Design a protein with these regions (language model features):
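Structured alpha/beta reader/binder surfaces that contact nucleic acids or chromatin modification marks
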Residues: 1-182
Length: 182
């Protein structure tokens, strides 16, 4: 079994395109808080109504591809990642300083992340994304549903070459620490 993190499909495509280098996590509805189940994982793509309103306009070209990866019948797993750094947000008022590192609107981050369980801190994951050599189609099952961060998949795909270098992501991690860490 392989660990997979549920992540919005648009973000997975942004990671693969090199537009995004971070994830913003607080945990699912059925979790008290986000915990890192593994430092290397696949992405299980998800989709939600209102995706377009959550993504900045300059990234709307990702939405058609993203929607096709997460349907009622199946998901297409096309990427994985390694965590370079996990940084708790100590200065949420400074999140705009790292907006260039992700595709989400400021309103989406506030509503979907900061206002959800406001006593719990948001975590920024700096990740090194990898495309899979061949995408894997998985039938959607009942155990994939629900508001949890992690699922186990019975797949062992071959990983391709990382999107970003280690040194580039070390600079991203430093920028995140300086901007919002605490």
């Amino acid at each position: 079994m392989t660990t997979a993190l549920k992540e919005w499909s648009a973000a997975v495509h942004a990671l693969l395109d090199g537009r995004q280098t971070i994830l913003l996590r607080k945990g699912g509805i059925h979790e008290k808080r986000f915990t890192l189940a593994d430092s290397r994982f696949l992405f299980f793509p998800t989709a939600v109504h209102g995706h377009a309103e959550r993504v900045r306009p300059e990234h709307h070209d990702l939405l058609p591809r993203a929607g096709a990866d997460s349907t009622e019948a199946q998901v297409v797993v096309r990427a994985g990642a390694e965590v370079v750094a996990a940084i708790e947000v100590g200065r949420p008022e400074e999140l705009e300083e790292i907006a260039a590192l992700h595709i989400w609107t400021a309103e989406s981050i506030r509503a979907d992340r900061l206002d959800f369980r406001p006593k719990h801190r948001l975590t920024v994951l700096v990740v090194r994304a990898y495309p899979l050599v061949a995408p894997v189609r998985i039938p959607r099952r009942d155990e994939h549903r629900g508001c949890s961060s992690w699922v186990q998949l019975d797949v062992a795909p071959q990983w391709g070459t990382a999107v970003h270098t280690e040194s580039a992501l070390a600079r991203v991690a430093q920028r995140v620490r300086e901007s919002v860490g605490g």
